[in-house]
C-alpha cells in the first residue's frame, strides 16, 4: 500500500475544547522531605497544584468517565509524580511483570518531560503492577535506573514515579523552565488520555513531536552536580560456541563468517549538560538481531529498523527536519542499516539553545565514513532548518551494502514551517552528490523534494513535487527510486462521531502521483483510496484499492534507464485490492486478519518481469497466558499465478510463513523468549527455512546485564550458535 509520512507536521483529530495547552504556565513545587505514599491529600503532595481535567484524545472528549488526577514535586535529587487513576466498571489490566517488556499491553500512567526545549524529551510510565517503561527522543537504548510503585484498590489504582535528575540531560542553569505532560492508557478500551491538549495532537505515546503543545514548568531547581550526567562506560565480555559460532549478520541482511569479538567497549562522556562524546570499540551486535522477515513481494527496496546502540543513540540529530516519504522510507543520505559490522566509531552529539548537532565517524573492514547533522528548531516546533553531509570512502570487498570501491560525498539541506493557527505548512529538501561513479555530479545526482500542506481538525491536504536525478544514489543512504520528476497529492478526511454512533472514529484517504523520467516517459504512477473505520466494540476495518505502474528498462532488469539510453522500457503493474479486519487492536488480546489480491509483477530466475496475479493473506494474534507467559502467533501466505507457454493454462507458486513466540517473565528484571519461524515454498519474498531461536536476559541491581542467546531470529534458518554476553556498566544508566 502506498503511504505518505511527514515529519514536523501533525495529524488531524476531531475538534474539541482545549483543557491545558502550551500557553499555560506552572511553577515547580520544591520540597525538603520526599513523599512516602500515594495519598495526594497528604504532605508534601498537598503543597503541589493538583493536575486534573484530562482529555480522552482517542475520542476527543473530556475524560470524565475515567478521571485522572496527579501532583508533581521536586527535591534536590528527584522528580516525584503521584497519579490516581479511577477506573470503576472497566477491568484494570496488569499482565506484564518484567520492566521494558510488553509496553502498551497493560494500563499505564506516565509523565513526559522536555528538559531543554530542544529535543531532550523523556517519557516515564508505570503500570498497575509497578512495571516500568521509559523512552528518550535521543535513543531507543534509554534504560536508566529509576523507581515506580503502584497500588490497586477496588476499581481504582495509584502510582508513584521517582525519577532522578541525574539521569536527565538538563540545561546548564540552577533554575530552569521545562515543558511537561501527564498521560494515561486504558488497555481494555485501547484509549489514551492526555492532560496537555491540542486538537492536532496524535493519539499514541510516546510522541515526541507533541511536546510543542505542552505547558511550561518554571522554577525547576537543578543542583550543579545534577546538571551534567555522569560519564558512562560499558565493557562487554562475550563467548560464542557451536557450529555457527562465527556467523554474524551483515549489511545485506545475510549471514557470513566473521571473527567473534570477545571484548568490546562503549563509552559516553558528557562535555556539557546536553553535549556528549560517544565512542565504540569492537562493538558486538549479536543481542540486537531481530526478526524483520517477510514473504510479501515488494515493489521497492524495503527499509529496515536500526537497533545497534552506537547508531540508535542520537539518531534524530542526523534526520532532516520536515522529512517526508511517499511509498516507503524517505530518501536519506545516511541510512545506518547499510553499514555492516564495524571496528570502531566516534560521535559528538547534543544540543545548545535551539540548535542540535551530531558528528559521526565509523570505520571497519574496507570503509571509513563520516556524517554531519545540524538542526535549528524553534521551541514550538513550528519552524526549523537542517544540514546533513556524508563523506564515504569504500574499498573493494568492504562490509557495507555497497561492497565496491567507491568514494562519495553528499549534502542535504532542508527547511520546514508549520502554522498551528492557519494549518498551513511547507517543507523543502534539496540534496546533491558527487562521487567516483561515472556522472555522479550535482547536475545528475541530486534530489529536490518539496511539500505544501493544509492540516485541519477534520481534513488534511498534502501537495508534493519531487525531482530526483538519474544518478542520485548515496552509497550510505537509502533511495527508493531515482530519475523521477512530477507532482503528487494526498487528501484525507476524518471524523469522530461521538454520541450514540457505533463508530469511534473513521477516515477516508486518497493519494495519487505521476512521475516522469528524463526521456519524458512515465517512470512511476500511483493511485490509492483507503477507508479506515474503528468501531466502539473494538472492531477495526480497513479497505481500499491501490494501483501502481512502474517503468523498467533493459527488458525489465533495471530500475533506472539513463545509462542505457532508456532502451527496452517496459511498464509493469503493482496493483492490489486489500481488506483488513482487526478486533481488540491495542489491547492485550488482539486478533488481526488481512487479504489482498491483484496483478502484481514478479520476476523470474533471470530477473526478468513476468505477469503475475498475487493473492496474499495474514492472520495474527497474541495474548498473555497466566501471569508469567505471553504468546503470539502469525501465519502469512502468498499465492502467485503466472502464464505458461500454453495460453490457456497458468502456473502457480506460493509461500507460507508461520511464526510463533513465547515469552516468560522471571521477575522485574529477567525474561526468557522462544521463537519459531518457518517459511516453505519459493513463490514469495523470503528464503525458505526453519528458524528456532531463544534468548534470556537478566538485568542486575548494579545495572549490569547478562544475555544468553541461542541462534538469532534474524536468520532465514537456525543458526547453530550460543552466545553468552555480560555487560559491565560504570556510571549512569544505558542511554543517558
Can you say where each PLM-predicted feature lies in the sequence?
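Exposed, low-structure sequence patches enriched in small/polar residues
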Residues: 341, 425-736
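Catalytic-domain carbohydrate-binding cleft regions of carbohydrate-active enzymes
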Residues: 161, 179, 256-257, 285-473, ...
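Outer-envelope beta-barrel architecture signal
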Residues: 77-79, 120-122, 157, 174-178, ...
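Surface-exposed extracellular loop regions of Gram-negative outer-membrane beta-barrel proteins
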Residues: 226-278, 367-433, 497-500, 505-509, ...
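Outer-membrane beta-barrel transmembrane domain signature of Gram-negative proteins
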Residues: 205-226, 365-404, 543-588, 593, ...
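Bacterial N-terminal signal peptides
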Residues: 1-11
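Structural preference for beta-rich elements and adjacent junctions enriched in aromatics
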Residues: 18-371
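Boundary at the C-terminal end of the N-terminal hydrophobic targeting segment
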Residues: 11, 15-18
Amino acid at each position: 500500500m502506498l503511504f505518505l509520512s511527514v515529519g514536523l507536521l501533525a495529524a488531524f483529530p476531531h475538534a474539541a475544547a482545549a483543557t491545558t495547552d502550551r500557553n499555560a504556565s506552572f511553577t515547580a513545587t520544591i520540597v525538603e522531605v520526599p513523599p512516602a505514599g500515594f495519598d495526594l491529600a497528604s504532605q508534601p503532595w498537598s503543597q503541589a497544584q493538583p493536575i486534573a481535567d484530562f482529555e480522552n484524545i482517542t475520542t476527543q472528549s473530556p475524560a470524565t468517565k475515567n478521571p485522572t488526577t496527579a501532583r508533581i514535586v521536586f527535591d534536590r535529587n528527584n522528580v516525584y509524580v503521584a497519579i490516581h487513576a479511577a477506573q470503576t466498571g472497566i477491568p484494570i489490566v496488569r499482565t506484564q511483570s518484567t520492566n521494558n517488556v510488553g509496553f502498551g499491553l497493560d494500563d499505564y500512567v506516565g509523565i513526559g518531560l522536555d528538559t531543554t526545549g530542544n529535543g531532550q524529551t523523556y517519557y516515564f510510565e508505570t503500570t498497575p503492577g509497578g512495571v516500568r517503561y521509559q523512552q528518550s527522543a535521543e535513543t531507543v537504548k534509554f534504560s536508566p535506573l529509576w523507581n515506580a510503585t503502584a497500588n490497586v484498590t477496588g476499581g481504582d489504582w495509584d502510582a508513584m514515579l521517582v525519577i532522578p535528575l541525574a539521569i536527565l540531560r538538563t540545561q546548564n542553569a540552577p533554575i530552569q523552565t521545562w515543558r511537561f505532560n501527564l498521560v494515561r492508557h486504558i488497555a481494555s478500551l485501547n484509549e489514551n488520555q492526555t492532560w496537555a491538549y491540542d486538537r492536532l495532537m496524535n493519539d499514541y505515546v510516546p510522541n515526541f513531536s507533541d511536546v510543542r503543545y505542552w505547558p511550561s514548568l518554571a522554577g525547576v531547581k537543578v543542583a550543579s552536580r545534577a546538571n551534567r550526567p555522569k560519564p558512562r562506560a560499558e565493557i562487554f565480555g562475550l563467548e560464542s560456541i557451536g557450529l555457527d559460532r562465527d556467523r554474524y549478520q551483515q549489511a545485506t541482511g545475510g549471514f557470513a563468517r566473521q571473527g567473534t569479538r570477545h571484548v568490546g567497549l562503549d563509552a559516553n562522556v558528557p562535555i556539557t549538560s546536553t553535549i556528549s562524546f560517544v565512542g565504540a570499540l569492537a562493538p558486538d551486535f549479536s543481542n540486537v538481531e531481530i526478526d524483520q522477515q517477510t514473504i510479501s513481494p515488494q515493489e521497492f527496496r524495503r527499509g529496515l529498523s536500526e537497533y545497534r546502540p552506537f547508531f540508535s543513540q542520537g539518531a534524530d540529530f542526523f534526520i532532516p527536519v520536515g522529512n517526508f516519504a511517499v511509498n516507503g522510507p524517505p530518501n536519506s543520505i545516511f541510512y545506518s542499516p547499510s553499514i555492516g559490522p564495524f571496528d570502531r566509531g566516534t560521535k559528538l552529539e547534543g544540543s545548545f539553545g535551539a540548535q542540535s548537532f551530531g558528528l559521526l565517524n565509523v570505520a571497519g573492514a574496507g570503509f571509513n565514513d563520516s556524517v554531519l547533522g545540524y538542526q535549528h528548531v524553534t521551541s514550538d516546533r513550528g519552524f526549523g532548518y537542517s544540514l546533513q553531509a556524508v563523506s564515504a570512502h569504500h574499498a573493494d570487498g568492504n562490509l557495507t551494502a555497497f561492497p565496491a570501491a567507491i568514494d562519495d560525498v553528499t549534502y542535504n539541506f532542508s527547511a520546514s514551517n508549520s502554522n498551528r493557527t492557519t494549518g498551513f505548512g511547507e517543507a523543502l529538501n534539496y540534496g546533491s552528490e558527487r562521487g567516483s561513479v561515472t556522472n555522479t555530479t550535482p547536475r545528475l545526482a541530486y534530489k529536490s523534494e518539496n511539500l505544501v500542506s493544509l492540516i485541519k481538525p477534520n481534513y488534511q491536504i498534502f501537495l508534493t513535487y519531487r525531482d530526483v536525478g538519474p544518478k542520485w544514489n548515496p552509497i550510505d543512504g537509502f533511495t527508493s527510486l531515482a530519475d523521477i520528476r512530477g507532482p503528487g497529492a494526498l487528501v484525507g478526511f476524518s471524523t469522530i462521531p461521538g454520541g450514540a454512533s457505533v463508530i469511534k472514529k473513521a477516515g477516508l484517504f486518497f493519494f495519487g502521483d505521476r512521475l516522469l523520467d528524463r526521456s519524458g516517459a512515465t517512470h512511476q504512477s500511483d493511485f490509492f483510496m483507503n477507508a479506515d473505520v474503528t468501531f466502539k466494540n473494538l472492531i477495526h476495518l480497513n479497505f481500499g484499492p491501490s494501483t501502481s505502474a512502474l517503468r523498467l528498462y533493459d527488458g525489465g532488469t533495471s530500475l533506472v534507464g539513463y545509462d542505457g539510453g532508456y532502451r527496452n522500457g517496459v511498464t509493469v503493474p503493482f496493483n492490489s485490492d486489500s481488506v483488513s479486519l482487526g478486533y481488540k487492536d491495542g489491547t492485550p488480546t488482539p486478533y488481526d486478519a488481512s487479504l489482498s489480491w491483484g496483478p502484481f509483477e514478479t520476476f523470474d530466475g533471470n530477473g526478468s518481469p513476468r505477469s503475475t496475479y498475487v493473492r496474499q493473506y495474514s492472520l495474527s494474534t497474541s495474548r498473555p497466558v497466566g501471569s508469567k507467559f505471553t504468546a503470539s502467533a502469525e501465519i502469512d501466505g502468498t499465492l502467485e499465478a503466472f502464464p505458461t507457454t500454453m495460453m490457456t493454462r497458468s502456473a502457480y507458486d506460493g509461500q507460507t510463513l508461520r511464526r510463533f513466540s513465547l515469552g516468560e517473565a522471571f521477575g522485574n528484571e529477567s525474561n526468557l523468549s522462544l521463537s519459531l519461524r518457518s517459511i516453505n515454498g519459493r513463490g514469495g519474498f523470503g528464503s525458505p527455512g526453519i528458524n528456532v531461536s531463544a534468548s534470556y536476559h537478566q538485568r542486575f541491581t548494579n545495572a549490569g546485564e547478562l544475555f544468553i542467546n541461542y541462534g538469532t531470529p534474524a536468520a532465514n534458518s537456525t543458526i547453530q550458535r550460543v552466545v553468552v554476553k555480560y555487560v559491565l556498566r560504570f556510571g549512569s544508566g544505558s542511554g543517558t
